[in-house]
Amino acid sequence: MQFTIATVLSLLTITLAAPAAMERQVPYTPCSGLYGTAQCCATDVLGVADLDCANPPATLANATHFESTCAAIGQRARCCVLPILGQDILCQTPAGL
């Protein structure tokens, strides 16, 4: 009987000492699916083409960080289908912006 009480108290102590919530480290993916390329672009032409585009200069943490990173270099955050020589075809605003 004493062994059972000691075992239960030990398990209870371990359970209470564990962290209440485990924070998951999920990487931010700004663009997915067909529009899978994250870009910072200067000019949008009716959502069909974007001009003067480049990869974001920093690793992105969230949608707001993506927007501010591109804004810091005078460009807009975009998710594009096909980047070709600084011009991107079919772009849209990233989710969360």
Curated annotation (Swiss-Prot):
<feature type="disulfide bond">
    <location>
        <begin position="40"/>
        <end position="70"/>
    </location>
</feature>
<keyword id="KW-0964">Secreted</keyword>
<keyword id="KW-0732">Signal</keyword>
<dbReference type="InterPro" id="IPR036686">
    <property type="entry name" value="Hydrophobin_sf"/>
</dbReference>
<comment type="subunit">
    <text>Homotrimer. Further self-assembles to form highly ordered films at water-air interfaces through intermolecular interactions.</text>
</comment>
<feature type="disulfide bond">
    <location>
        <begin position="31"/>
        <end position="79"/>
    </location>
</feature>
<dbReference type="InterPro" id="IPR010636">
    <property type="entry name" value="Cerato-ulmin_hydrophobin"/>
</dbReference>
<feature type="signal peptide">
    <location>
        <begin position="1"/>
        <end position="17"/>
    </location>
</feature>
<keyword id="KW-1015">Disulfide bond</keyword>
<dbReference type="Pfam" id="PF06766">
    <property type="entry name" value="Hydrophobin_2"/>
</dbReference>
<protein>
    <recommendedName>
        <fullName>Class II hydrophobin NC2</fullName>
    </recommendedName>
</protein>
<keyword id="KW-0325">Glycoprotein</keyword>
<feature type="disulfide bond">
    <location>
        <begin position="41"/>
        <end position="53"/>
    </location>
</feature>
<dbReference type="GO" id="GO:0005576">
    <property type="term" value="C:extracellular region"/>
</dbReference>
<keyword id="KW-0134">Cell wall</keyword>
<comment type="similarity">
    <text>Belongs to the cerato-ulmin hydrophobin family.</text>
</comment>
<feature type="disulfide bond">
    <location>
        <begin position="80"/>
        <end position="91"/>
    </location>
</feature>
<comment type="function">
    <text>Aerial growth, conidiation, and dispersal of filamentous fungi in the environment rely upon a capability of their secreting small amphipathic proteins called hydrophobins (HPBs) with low sequence identity. Class I can self-assemble into an outermost layer of rodlet bundles on aerial cell surfaces, conferring cellular hydrophobicity that supports fungal growth, development and dispersal; whereas Class II form highly ordered films at water-air interfaces through intermolecular interactions but contribute nothing to the rodlet structure.</text>
</comment>
<feature type="glycosylation site" description="N-linked (GlcNAc...) asparagine">
    <location>
        <position position="62"/>
    </location>
</feature>
